[in-house]
């Protein structure tokens, strides 16, 4: 198998197309609109479920005939439509692809260890961290699902473990599969364990979950028995904190690639981009591009998606316990801290969007996705420039407002500056986002 490169050639960045993911309808790197890219994305970053989950089609139903559960009418594993291969409610007596029976809402098991109470968390200076498994910490595929290009890269049914590439064979219930750990996954767990009591929560079956968690945590030092699977979930189509005894909203942080899986806990959620390493996963989410495995590429360790998440977790943890200290242990709520951390990114920036006749005015008006993102990050958005304006966001360098920014020595940036800040949870260097003829095209 050829050696996998991490991140590709920096000199050629950004690597678009294919687009690595979309933030509220825009590519997180180049800023292209999703509807203009013909599905050319490896994964979807921080968007709504309708943006994130691509319809898998009936072919997927055949490869996942017993679906573990459905989110917004799509199988949580293969992406097939709920009507394509049976619904979760009709499969209660069946064994799913991972071998566990799909549990009815009234009959979950209760084997999940109890979460520490608030007093214990405050004493140990820890919070609760719930991590999704598939597409967040790793990606798995069946050995017979490799594409022709992947087979040419050495991905065959006879493939062996390759720890150097973090590729491992697993066989839950005798189904041969290959799991690829996401770069930085083990480092994330090692560093986060000092700040959090950690759980894995997946809608997949328990044996599949436990086999893959063992790859991440072979000695059980990070998770122990704190693994929530479809057996423990009360519903096959959503996740809820009530399956973890003692878990309180005010002390729980959630990291997941699917926001619709947590309809009751959106304020606890740190939404991240979906990890789709194998071609079969790209196909299931309807991305007609070469997979990372096909291209011999992977996310970078030092500044990939999980490294970004760890940085956010550090800030949330610090913010929570700073609040505990300031209020003598009272009223600290991690949900408010997450909003505050997010809202600090562009705090102090007053942004005005500049349009040209060639651009879609709806793209930058009030309540548009880019306007909402800027406000979520703490910026003040205005319709017209004045002495308080700090940034003019434009694609065309010849607009009146763009010229005003140059004349008044204000920051003139293209829209990617806001999108990148949202992806990285940090204000970006304005010089890296110039407005020129290329951005106007």
Where are these regions (language model features)?
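C-terminal folded domains that constitute the principal catalytic or ligand-binding module
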Residues: 185-186, 259-334, 346, 369
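Substrate-recognition "cap/lid" segment bordering the active-site pocket of phosphatases
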Residues: 206, 210-250
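Eukaryotic beta-rich interaction modules
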Residues: 55, 107-122, 129, 179-186, ...
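Long, acidic (Asp/Glu-rich), low-complexity accessory segments flanking structured domains
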Residues: 1-126, 138-160
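Interaction modules related to DNA damage response and DNA replication/repair
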Residues: 27, 42-43, 341-417
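Substrate-recognition element of Asp-dependent hydrolases with the DxDx(T/V) motif
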Residues: 180, 185-214, 230, 351
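Core residues of folded domains in eukaryotic genome-function proteins
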Residues: 21-28, 71-74, 124-137, 188, ...
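Short coil/turn segments at secondary-structure boundaries
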Residues: 31-32, 87-93, 141-153, 204, ...
